[in-house]
A protein has these predicted regions:
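ATPase nucleotide-binding head domains, primarily ABC-like/P-loop NTPase cores
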Residues: 68, 369, 376-593
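Alpha-helical coupling/stalk and coiled-coil linker elements that connect catalytic or binding modules
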Residues: 1-424, 431-460, 483-484
């Protein structure tokens, strides 16, 4: 159903694009016909002194100007339509699995010192970040990366994001529009340095410059009017014109330096202005989203200030024409006025500009988190439990990075203690742990989770799942795992809630040492403030419950049909009674019948 919605949006957008292309062709044809006709009418009318032809030429000139303006507007709409198609394709990629080839995977945000980043596929190829990311700006991407944490931080902010994301889920078309407008920005756009420049205050010398510009521009205007209409001498306006032009040339290096930010982001200013207007008109009236958008309305309204700044940027850009530079500066000291007005704008709205850009960065995070609800039929907002002991309850939980139609939902009802999971190779043990861990990360970010219900006590997630040798550091797989488990034990001394996920504990050593070490590690990690999940092929660990340790057992099964091994990937209570390693060895041709 959700996929069908985005397919319909894509089809409608393709029809719109086709219509716009036809309109573009008509505009090009009309301009091609009108311009020479206008030129011919004006020239011929002037030659033969025919007022009617001159009027026709004037009408065609006006028509040509209108056609150019409409054509430019259509080109902007065509670019936005292309962005719509790209965004819609991104949503559809989440249903087909093609999202795993998207370039922005957040690999740079993953840290080796944070094992969950790799173990739970938070960053990197085929990761939570890659699936979610709707951010175009650098600030938005950094905020999203910071939100995807295995450690609960500010639950008040998490709940606020949940409420804001819930509001976005009601408006999927608005989400597409916002993403499409954001997609027009340069990839990885970073505006922090620019925001700092915009916030610089007006200097006292610029106040003097502003006064100079007003005085001498007024003097030239009055002298010109006096010479033109009162019979005065043209020497004075000519002198003032040359004087003003000389002043403008003298100030040119400083003018260039002061107006440089406008030149760098003239296009971005227009794009941000359209984004802010879309946000102001958006039907997002909830308290949480109102708090996010508040900086757009106070102390300075973003759209009003941005519109003025865009106009100023366009005025500053006109200086690049040499003829305009000479005429405008000789008559009006154009450069000085632009510089002074820009400085005044910075005083009035410069400090607020950084806040506007932060609003968009936060909206990009919310659009990213809403991706789960837009693309998964089964999803829910998690409930955070305020309980003294850790608890995690989930129904129909699936991993986000596996297609929903192929993922097998599983339940979890976990409290303080240890769950030992046994099962054959490829039966789903590791995926089950990752499902719980990754959904916990989504919960802390403020996103919906892939489950029909999900409730948990806020707890730090510690993992030991995907371990490899560190040749440069001289650390073996076994020793790397020891270091991770040591960190778990050190953190456990704080008495804070923990979710501990260990896959195939101590796999890097011989079976005798592994069993002894695993039994001791499980004893020390079975705590009243921790939920510990351990997968293993060592059935001896299933007997810890008989020794008074609060350990429960669960398992995954397989069954055989002819020469095929099949899994249902459903977790069951109790210990596993089957193995499949020898069967897999025979299937691979390594072991004979």
């Amino acid at each position: 159903m959700k996929k069908q919605f985005y397919e319909n949006v894509r089809e409608n957008t393709i029809v719109l694009e086709r219509t716009q292309n036809n309109q573009r062709t008509r505009f090009i044809l009309a301009r091609t016909v009108v311009f020479p006709a206008m030129f011919a009418a004006l020239i011929h009318g002037y030659d033969v002194d025919a007022p009617a032809e001159m009027m026709l030429g004037g009408f065609l000139l006006l028509l040509f100007v209108v056609l150019v303006a409409r054509h430019r507007k259509l080109e902007r709409l065509r670019l936005l339509t292309k962005a719509y198609l790209a965004v819609t394709a991104g949503y559809l990629a989440r249903f087909t699995g093609e999202w795993k080839s998207l370039p922005e995977d957040g690999a740079g945000y993953g840290k080796e010192k944070r094992p969950p980043d790799r173990d739970l596929h938070i960053f990197g190829a085929a990761s939570l970040y890659q699936y979610l990311c709707a951010a175009r700006t650098q600030a938005g991407r950094e905020r999203l990366a910071a939100a995807l944490t295995a450690t609960p931080r500010d639950l008040a902010r998490t709940r606020q994001r949940q409420a804001a994301v819930a509001e976005l889920l009601v408006h999927p078309l608005l989400c597409i529009e916002l993403e499409a407008r954001g997609a027009r920005l340069p990839d990885g756009h970073d505006t922090r340095a620019l925001a700092k420049e915009l916030a610089q205050p007006l200097s006292s010398s610029l106040k003097v410059i502003s006064c100079i510009g007003i005085v001498f521009a007024s003097a030239f205007a009055l002298s010109f009017l006096w010479a033109a209409f009162a019979g005065g001498s043209w020497i004075l306006p000519l002198f003032l014109f040359m004087f003003n032009l000389t002043v403008a040339i003298a100030f040119y290096p400083r003018t260039q330096r002061e107006l440089a930010p406008l030149g760098r982001m003239a296009r971005e200013l227009r794009l941000y202005g359209r984004i802010f207007r879309t946000l102001e008109r958006a039907p997002l009236r909830g308290e949480a989203f109102a708090a996010v958008l508040a900086p757009l309305f106070a102390p300075v309204r973003a759209t009003t200030a941005q519109s003025r700044l865009t106009t100023l940027a366009e005025c500053a850009a006109m200086r690049r024409n040499v003829l305009f530079f000479m005429l405008a500066n000789g008559a009006l000291l154009w450069d000085l006025h632009c510089m002074a007005y820009f400085s005044h704008w910075r005083v009035q709205a410069g400090t607020a500009a950084a806040g506007w850009l932060k609003v968009w960065a936060e909206v990009e995070v919310l659009l990213s988190l809403a991706r789960v609800g837009h693309t998964r039929a089964v999803h829910t907002f998690p409930q955070f439990l305020d309980e003294a002991v850790p608890r995690l309850d989930a129904q129909e939980a699936t991993p986000l990075v596996i297609a929903e139609e192929t993922a097998t939902p599983n339940d979890a009802h976990l409290a303080a203690g240890t769950l030992v999971i046994t099962g054959s190779n490829m039966s789903g043990k590791t995926t089950y742990m990752r499902t719980l861990g990754s959904n916990t990360v989504l919960a802390y970010a403020g996103a919906p989770v892939c489950a029909s219900s999900f409730a948990l006590t806020p707890m730090a997630v510690y993992t030991s799942i995907q371990i490899s040798d560190d040749l440069a550091g001289g650390i073996s797989t076994f020793y790397a795992e020891l270091l991770r488990i040591k960190k778990m034990m050190e953190y456990s001394k704080r008495g804070k809630p923990m979710l501990i996920l260990i896959d195939e504990i101590f796999r890097g050593t011989n079976s005798a040492d592994r069993i002894v070490g695993a039994r001791e590690a499980i004893r020390r990690l079975t705590l009243p403030h921790a939920i510990t999940i351990v997968t293993t092929h060592d059935f001896e660990l299933c007997d810890l419950g008989r020794e008074g340790v609060p350990v429960a057992n669960a398992h995954f099964e397989e069954h055989y049909e002819g020469d095929k091994i099949l899994f249902d990937f459903k977790i069951r209570t109790g210990r596993c009674r089957t193995t499949n390693a020898q069967y897999l060895l025979r299937m691979a041709g390594i072991m004979g019948d």
